[in-house]
C-alpha cells in the first residue's frame, strides 16, 4: 500500500488525495475560500471540480483586486488619509498579496487532484 503524497503548498485542512474522505475535506475547504453565497448553488455543490474552478477564479480575482489596490493606494488615498494610514494600507495589501499567492497555489493543487492527478514523492 502506498502512502499518500502531497506537494509543498497543499492545504493542511485537506486530507491527501486518495485518503478516506479527502474529497469531503476538499469541498469544505473550497467552500470556505469562496463567498458564502456559493454554498447555495446546487451546480457548484454537486460538482467538486466545478467548485474548484470557481474557487481558483475567486482567488485570482482577489489577487487582481490587491494588485489594483497597491497600484492606486497613494493616489486614491492621499486625500482621505494621512501618510501613515496609507503606508499601513499598503503593508496590509502586501501581506494579503503574499497570503493569496499561497492560497492560489493550494487551490490549484486541490483542483488538479480533483481532476485526477496524483502526486509522487521525488528525491
Model-found features: residue ranges?
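Eukaryotic low-complexity, intrinsically disordered regulatory segments enriched in serine, proline
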Residues: 17-123
